[in-house]
């Protein structure tokens, strides 16, 4: 990558020296030790590495990895079958079929499904927003708002087959929070069937053996996030788990406004024996999901998204549940739970606020042979639906995997095996800025931590990410915005510069060094060089020392204003400008500007000479830039003056905010 050139400003008179800060007072030894221990603990948790190490713009291959909609799509839904090169996207009155064949140009076909209802009060209400796409035996099921008359269609070999109005399959408005879950011939939904009544949200079985719904009192203004069916050891014990957040029943002013929950239902629930319970779920229980860090006193109580990663051995209890949470300041945390822990909480916990002996069978217990739940058991669970025990994250500390100042909204996780055989879990998290963070979960090594590898810009034009789907077979990520659909590789090894050291310092388990290139482990038939030492990966390279930066020279007149700019390729490194063994400027990790800039306000004779921009990242040290400032001669001055005039506008405007901030701080 070509670094931005240094810039020059007009000469100025010398400035009076400003007194430096007062001498630093010594801290007591005990306090210094406590601060060191706190810093070490924070580093071990990975919070200091929660920001992305590098920033990458995914340009893709021309014509192959991005396709525009051709119109603005404010609401999209994406359907992708693992291993397929095709992606279905539902939009406004249309269903798009994108095809991304390997190594060939992408294509798009459009199926029009316009509104069939002509009368509507608002133009926006006249649209048919497709909100559901699902593969069924009859074809691809597409359901939409249809001018506030929710309806469905089957797409069969490019033909649209109307199915008429189907309440519960699509909301009346695309802005409504909704979930629809399919399992065989069964359909579960949180969508209300009537537009102007029944406004209390419910979780329903709308197709199956018997229609059921949750009691109106067991949830308070829920926002549904995810639902799944878990097949347990006995078929009658199969569970429906759904994740949501709701208003906090604790009205203490210091209590959070929202709490995050997981609810359980028995899939074989047939309703109750009494008139009050015959049409209701009789096995509903809910538990609080905890995602907090006691060491920093940070609580994250707003669940944003959930991703379930099944265990490769097929053990349902070892399924990992990744939850993305936020707090009122839109900082985020990722907490990981196990289905086994969730199941144990529901099986063994007492009920919150209930102090008598539990009835038999206990609330939430699934019964064999589709037996109805006794009325007493239903009444206790209906009045006390929350279990007392909370669901805590996995691990001995019961803390978040990591937390971050970024606002994450969606998550997908890929389990992969590196070249040396170690298994990694790689998280892909969307931000509210329309980017994707690629984070490696800590391994089993001592002192390992979550590592944020990079931030990816997936679109041609910046926009919010509406949908995301991960294909583990093709190793692709599919994301959509209001403008386009993009196919992003999971590896992206070509973005790492700096030779072998830069490749291994990325700590990207998808990438390795082979035959002078940083390549994907999937593109090589033999084992590639990867680091097995997460603390000092650069030491695995054949040449232990990175190459020195090439010397660049510039001639300047005395008393000139000038700046030297060094691109901060790694945001986890400290960049320093050194001149005659003195550090003139230092830019720490988290520095807001993409460049570390040394501003020379008034060039004196002592300030001519060699300037080195040096990057320090752990034990890895490299020389990023090397400049020599020379006294100006007539010929060189004329050449440089012309060059500076040509670049003055763009360069000066680009660095002016950073220079202003630097001068104010100075």
From Swiss-Prot:
Short motif (Cell attachment site): ranges: 267-269
Effect the entry attributes to changing residue 460 to H: Results in JMH-variant phenotype
Signal peptide range in chain numbering: 1-44
Xref: InterPro entries: Ig-like_dom (IPR007110), Ig-like_dom_sf (IPR036179), Ig-like_fold (IPR013783), Plexin_repeat (IPR002165), PSI (IPR016201), Sema7A_sema (IPR042824), Semap_dom (IPR001627), Semap_dom_sf (IPR036352)
Keyword list, A-Z: Cell membrane, Developmental protein, Differentiation, Disease variant, Disulfide bond, Glycoprotein, GPI-anchor, Immunoglobulin domain, Inflammatory response, Intrahepatic cholestasis, Lipoprotein, Membrane, Methylation, Neurogenesis, Signal
Region (Disordered): 1-21
Domain Sema, residue spans: 53-490
Subunit structure as annotated in this protein's UniProt entry: Interacts with ITGA1 and ITGB1. Interacts with PLXNC1.
Function: Plays an important role in integrin-mediated signaling and functions both in regulating cell migration and immune responses. Promotes formation of focal adhesion complexes, activation of the protein kinase PTK2/FAK1 and subsequent phosphorylation of MAPK1 and MAPK3. Promotes production of pro-inflammatory cytokines by monocytes and macrophages. Plays an important role in modulating inflammation and T-cell-mediated immune responses. Promotes axon growth in the embryonic olfactory bulb. Promotes attachment, spreading and dendrite outgrowth in melanocytes.
Protein name as it appears in the record: Semaphorin-7A
Gene: SEMA7A
